[in-house]
Amino acid sequence: MSSFHKNSSYMEDPDYPGYSGSQNHTQNYLRTQDDLEFPGCLDNPGFHHPRRNPYSSDSRTNPDYHHSLAEPDYPGSPSDADYQNTRCHPRSAHPRTRPDYEPDYEPDYNDFQSESYHPDLSMEPDYPGSHGHPGFAGVRSSVNSTGPRTNLGYLDLEEPDYPGAQGNSYHSGPRSHSNLPGSRRNAGYAGSRINSYPDSLGEPDYPGAENQPNSPDFYGKPDYPGAEEGDVYSPSKTLGVIGRSRGSFGILGREDGDYPEGIEMASLGMAGDPRNGYVNPAYMRGSSPVCPDRNLLLCARDWNTSPQGQKLIASLVPMTSRDRIKTIRNQPRTMQEKRELRKIVDKEKNKQSHGTFEANCCAQCLSSLSLAYRRTKSSLSELLNYISLWQKRFKVIGGKFGTSVLSYFSFLRWLLKFNIFSFVMNFSFIIIPQFTVGEKNTLQFTGLEFFTGAGYFRETVMYYGFYTNSTIRHRMGGASYNMQLAYIFTIGACLVICFFSLLFSMAKYFRNNFINPHIYSRGIAKLIFCWDFTVTHEKAVKLKQKNLSTEIRENLSEIRQENDRLTLNQKLTRFSVHVAAWLVSTGITAACCVAVYYLAEYNSEFLKTHKNPGAVLLLPFVVSCINLAVPRFYSMFRLVERYEIPRQEVYVLLIRNIFLKISIVGILCYYWLNIVALSGEECWETLIGQDIYRLLLMDFVFSLADSLLGEFLRRLIGMKFITSLSLQEFDIARNVLELIYAQTLAWLGIFFCPLLPFIQMITLFIMFYVKNVSLMMNFQPPSKAWRASQMITFFIFLLFFPSFTGVLCTLAITIWRLKPSADCGPFRGLPSFIQSIYSWIDTLSHRPGYLWVVWIYQNLIGSVHFFFILTLIVLIITYLYWQITEGRKVMIRLLHEQIINEGKDKMFLIEKLTKLQDIERRANPSTLVLERREVEQQSPLHLEELDAAPDLRLRRSMQEENAIA
């Protein structure tokens, strides 16, 4: 086997034709042992040549040796029946086993050294007993043999057979001199470790190779007698290497050949280790022991001492902290190497700045503060992610059902945060002060109050009518607390903060999901080629795999939907169906609103004449039934409309359902503000609060029953009775509209029932776990995978308009136009709720220190012109932002098309280059041999596959030449 030097040229290769063949091959041979990519390298696990020599007289596999492991049974071996008690070449006149044997260092065939190479000769010697002899059973070069290497039909290019190669015995170099004095390949040599068989084990045969001190065999252990007594080489190491060396060809050679040259070779790491006594010269002399043929910047060791590493460190020192961190972060290194690089750069920077410490004191302080700020920010971010609600649950849901179903639970958690904030505000500034002056409740609690909200709860902090209108002052001359201002400012602050939070959230999600360049590339590179290697837990790995699979299906579905095109008739048909569905849904919504209004009036008249506590539940029960049944009827329209894109179907259902629910809430608000508030009822604010509480509670009960009973029964029917139904899919539109409807009621009732955010918080917390369990048990993943990156943005938009804006309009009418109750609430006795603000401003106008507050109110808050100018500015900024967004979209689209065109240009050039190379190969087929050698040298791991499979390219070229001939 040739020993190719990766860092040398072909003229320095011992197997190259015309190589002079130095008698001393020790250095060149050993130099290849630490070349991991050399096909014949001892350290190459894919090398399949033998390590154990069954022919050596001193080998441990020799049957005469008392520790023999195997006995060869080939012709001419001691185990063969026809063996004539000789070990040397059958034509040798002096066999070593004869008593009168004398070492003969002359060649045992005639005129060996005098024979020169002739072009007409075959590629291998043909003397008697040689592989090249025509009469030899295992001949390779005989034209009559089925497998000669010089035959055109034989495509095995395992070893070169040109003059000067190891397989050619006419080569004048020492490797082919099997009978050269002192050669290991000479059968007459007493210390030989290999057989006279040419190229039997791929070992060096140069003179004196056996004199290397403690020279190991190919198992990492010497094969001379008594080797097992050494302290350096233990049997455990030998057995370990033996296990690695047993490849697909066995120990003795190829399965289809008569020569032992196909045995797999393992690493010589133990042999080359200086600790074993044997010091490989190449081990100590390599140009780069760590990374001999790679970039030093990517090396795992001593990278900082290389010129490239020093240059990198020198370039990082003058950088700012931000740029230095960004540069180190982008380095293709492990985290440990990046930390070491940062420490080295910090040390170098400290050395350079040691003399100018006083001058750079401020800069160092700023750098330290910046570093502390970044670390604190990172720690807080990690803490928030760690304590984030249901983080693991979200990963499971997203991995199994995709981002579309996950968007519902993300929206639910987002609403829960809103209600937690509102409850904290109300509890801190309204409820706690009222506890200090509240009177004891004398009503009896019966339990029915949980459903009706009346009775015992009427005289608690739950409703508006219980709060005092006085100024709280615990001692004379102390600080006072105006309950009227606290009530209206706290409710107003909650609504204002919710307003800006909704705007900020819509802007953030809009920027991430609508202006993201991934809408053109879809993040394919990140999706396919990125893997979080910090994920090591088996369950987490499987979950990550599910996530990747779901995201890939979502991206593929979008690509397929973009390529679908409809004909004109199909478009007209679908348009007609959509118009009809919209007309039917609008008519149903109008009918439901009319029914709810007349039911509310009838129920109010009925309650005046009947004192039945359960009668108050009739209106919320009917409204909840409508909200449960009508959206399911809307969902059946999908069978007729047949939307190809699932996102469009969800959008249409959302709009229809929100139109239904908001219309019902609007009719109820009209009834409350125009019928109940003007009816002269005692404490009408508390009555409205009770109605909203009952609506919210009844909606929660219906949702709970639908999840625990309805969805469970639907699963049983689909699995047991009507199997064609199978499992149902999660209805995102209907479930999201339930959340929006409940949150609308919570915002609407926050003025009349300050504890309503707390009730909504409890219901959302329970609904998450109920929906999660029902989802895992009763639903299947969506049949059409689709991404829902823009769904949360649409949900928040629907929550903002018309839900939140409708609530603001209703509360504005209540505060500015309606008269408060005369006997209850903090605003009792006032002509309007806003009158408390006017009285406060009048009081501040008589105090010189607060005149700036009066000016702000009169010229900004209370001025119509200010709000007109502010609205105009907001619209202008929105328009400019929209134009910038559209411009960026166009630029992103152009850049994306440019990248695609550049890729097409490269593919065109590659195809042209490939065609030119094919034409050149057909014109000069001999270049295929050198190309094969380059492939073997560059890809040693595939050497076994290349040897086992024929060279299809060579066969194709030869067939074309034969056809032309």
Swiss-Prot record:
Primary location recorded for the protein, binned into one broad class: membrane
Subcellular location: Membrane
This protein's GO CC annotations: plasma membrane
InterPro entries per record: TMC (IPR038900), TMC_dom (IPR012496)
UniProt membrane topology term: Multi-pass membrane protein
Record topology, Cytoplasmic segments: 439-444, 506-578, 635-657, 713-747, 816-859
Key words of the record: Membrane, Phosphoprotein, Transmembrane, Transmembrane helix
Segments on the Extracellular face: 1-417, 468-484, 600-613, 679-691, 769-794, 881-965
One MF annotation (Gene Ontology) recorded for this entry: mechanosensitive monoatomic ion channel activity
Region Disordered, residue ranges: 1-235
Positions of modified residues (Phosphoserine): S248
Keyword Secreted: no
Positions of transmembrane segments: 418-438, 445-467, 485-505, 579-599, 614-634, 658-678, 692-712, 748-768, 795-815, 860-880
UniProt biased composition (Basic and acidic residues): 61-70
Record's keyword annotation contains Membrane: yes
Family listed: Belongs to the TMC family.
Biological function: Probable component of an ion channel. Molecular function hasn't been characterized yet.
PANTHER family referenced in this protein's UniProt entry, alphabetically: TRANSMEMBRANE CHANNEL-LIKE PROTEIN 5, TRANSMEMBRANE CHANNEL-RELATED
Protein's recorded name: Transmembrane channel-like protein 5
Gene: Tmc5
